[in-house]
Amino acid sequence: GFKAGVKDYKLTYYTPEYETKDTDILAAFRVTPQPGVPPEEAGAAVAAESSTGTWTTVWTDGLTSLDRYKGRCYHIEPVVGEENQYIAYVAYPLDLFEEGSVTNMFTSIVGNVFGFKALRALRLEDLRIPTTYSKTFLGPPHGIQVERDKLNKYGRPFLGCTIKPKLGLSAKNYGRACYECLRGGLDFTKDDENVNSQPFXRWRDRXVFCAEAXYKAQAETGEIKGHYLNATAGTCEEMIKRAVFARELGAPIVMHDYLTGGFTANTSLAHYCRDNGLLLHIHRAMHAVIDRQKNHGMHFRVLAKALRMSGGDHIHAGTVVGKLEGEREMTLGFVDLLRDDFIEKDRARGIFFTQDWVSMPGVIPVASGGIHVWHMPALTEIFGDDSVLQFGGGTLGHPWXNAPGAAANRVALEACVQARNEGRDLAREGNEIIRAACKW
């Protein structure tokens, strides 16, 4: 029975007649094979290398049931308009993955295979997470409805502001900027993603001044205010220590950079936040390293799905209109994946699989990066009510300074929401609506 030697992957791992199971994790890869490598072989190689395969036939294959555990490439289609590029669909049996570990899921699916010689490039476009697997994750600490109830804010997007200059302010001046923005009418202020604990502002001092800012603004406005305290740190222990301190100060929300911090750290923090009533704001620093290339890497919708499983209440999702990249339909596709329970397959929006999250709470998308008051009508229309709109320079860059900048954003937002509720067309009349709002 046993013959050593190298053999074609497609003999074992390309199974076009396979019927996918409801418990399978399905992946859609954009495969660019090297010249001369047939697409079936390339697709099968991806399935093999990300599941049970190795480059040769091994004796120990006889000790397990490959049919039960192997990944299968079950469908291949050419990409329209691209030469020698294919979408390969791969099904992975549920047993290949550890329960409740995004880290393990990614190690399996994208761990090794991206350096594969037979491929010129490889991109993971989408994943279908079966409910049997997603149920092993706790997901977002609270979710959209709970957050609205905690903050007592309904029927409009939330407003945030990243404190700039992002690096260099002392703790006290930082807190002062927070206070002015919150007092002016924003719901949240935010630590920038790279504000952790540097020599010019240590985390504990910053947190104390920011908490003071929030309480003072809360007392004066009668609205609940929050500052995203960035708990990202060099070790998981230090990260939790910062989150504990935020809780002791009574802060409503903390923040984490989930890609640089890592999924393991992020999931730990999400569990802590759920147990202690903290909201969790997620920044996606480093995402473009992974998702910006069209032919290689991973699409952000995969990172977004992973975050919903790992846990976070807000996540940055591009703006469609600001300084950072993001196409409208694709962005709305993964915004729905973050917020909704059930998302239909829709290739025009980049959604390769129907995804059913069942009862897993949703994540609020955050639009942030180079947006300002004149983008407000577009943002209100694109993102709808369940979103956070964040204006950093768009608040602090106001010629009359921070509080008026914040007030301008709040007035513009309320005007846009009111106009929308009256049935006006924001896309067409947006500028007028904002001009009229300036007058009061």
Swiss-Prot record:
Post-translational modification as stated in the protein's UniProt record: The disulfide bond which can form in the large chain dimeric partners within the hexadecamer appears to be associated with oxidative stress and protein turnover.
Q: Pfam families recorded for this chain? A: RuBisCO_large, RuBisCO_large_N
Could you tell me what reaction this enzyme catalyses? 2 (2R)-3-phosphoglycerate + 2 H(+) = D-ribulose 1,5-bisphosphate + CO2 + H2O; D-ribulose 1,5-bisphosphate + O2 = 2-phosphoglycolate + (2R)-3-phosphoglycerate + 2 H(+)
Q: Which cofactor does it need?
A: Mg(2+)
Record's keyword annotation contains Acyltransferase: no
Q: Which GO CC terms are listed, alphabetically?
A: chloroplast
This protein's name: Ribulose bisphosphate carboxylase large chain
First and last residue of the signal peptide? none
Q: What GO terms are given for molecular function?
A: magnesium ion binding; monooxygenase activity; ribulose-bisphosphate carboxylase activity
Q: Does the keyword Magnesium apply?
A: yes
